[in-house]
Regions:
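N-terminal beta-strand motif that seeds the catalytic metal site of vicinal oxygen chelate
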Residues: 1-19, 73-78, 125-131
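Core segments of cupin and vicinal oxygen chelate
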Residues: 1, 8-52
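Short hydrophobic-acidic sequence motifs that mark active-site Asp/Glu residues
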Residues: 6, 54, 120
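Conserved hydrophobic/aromatic beta-strand scaffold that supports enzyme active sites
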Residues: 38-40, 77, 110-112
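Conserved, structured core segments of small domains
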Residues: 14, 25, 42-79, 84, ...
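A general marker of short, structured functional hotspots
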Residues: 2-3, 16-17, 21, 34, ...
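Vicinal oxygen chelate
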Residues: 9, 23, 30-32, 87-131
Length: 131
């Protein structure tokens, strides 16, 4: 079976995107390339045993989707310890709720957000008591 091993975030304003994801999730952004500008997106420490993947950040090559337009991309979902706490961080950092928190019964809490660049991403809090 083939696995996802990398993701990319496109941004109109790269500094704003790095600040958003750094403030909300604590991610780090080492510069990988000068031209075209490309940053890594480190979602865990280098030797972490946590499951997950790292990605990249690049300049958006075309206009962002308009509000209300469907997403024409894969959506990455971030596992968190406390959904409500992360929601507050997202909103404080300039993100918006795209689909409010809902239960995946017996499994988790799930919801979707827009970052400062208009990208959709999910948030997932495991909870076997969710209903």
């Amino acid at each position: 079976m083939n696995r996802v091993v990398h993701f990319e975030i496109q941004a109109e304003n790269l500094e704003r995107a790095m600040k958003f994801y750094g403030d909300v999730f604590g991610w780090q952004f080492p510069k990988w390339m000068e031209e075209p500008p490309y940053w890594g997106v480190m979602t865990a420490e280098k030797d972490s045993k946590e499951p997950g993947i790292n990605g990249g950040l690049l300049q958006r090559p075309c206009p962002a989707p308009t509000i209300g337009q469907g997403t024409n991309a894969f959506i990455c979902t971030v596992q968190v310890e406390n959904f409500d706490e992360i929601t507050k961080k997202i909103e404080t950092a300039g993100g918006k709720v795209a689909m409010p928190k809902f239960a995946l019964p017996g499994m988790a809490w799930q919801g979707y957000f827009l970052d400062t660049e208009g990208n959709t991403f999910g948030v997932h809090q495991a909870d076997k008591n969710a209903k």
